[in-house]
Amino acid sequence: METKQVFKLTNEALQTHNNFQWTVGEWCEAPGTGELCSKGWLHWYHSAELALLMNPIHANIDNPRLFVAEASGAMRDDFGLKGGSTKLRITQEIQYVAPTTEQRVKFAILCASAVCRDKSFIKWANGWLNGSDRSCGEAWAAYYAAADAAAAAAAA
């Protein structure tokens, strides 16, 4: 059976959504039906970093435990943000350092930069990322320019 190394977050009791119980080394199976964000799939992340960065908007687990896992069977992917498979087992708990505020902001800017084409936002984002401009005034100006552009696009 071919497997893929992935990463899984659990709570302190090795549980995930709806108190699904995990045991290190034991395979769990799902039918592979429905949308990725459903009980038909076992969810995981491509990297430890992505698991920790996405936790607040996905599982929102307080004090998560992070595991290396093996995924197998049918697989689905959500544009690289998370994945799911029909077979999954957690194999080894790993220690981690939680992302810093700066790392979270950088990640958010990179995500927004992938879709926002507003020139003032891009200028500000590049300045923030390269460290040349991290001023609040420029951040607010970029925010308002992007909001105005979004409102104009929605009205069109």
Regions found by a protein language model. Give the residues of each.
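Short, glycine-biased loop/turn motifs at secondary-structure junctions and
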Residues: 1-156
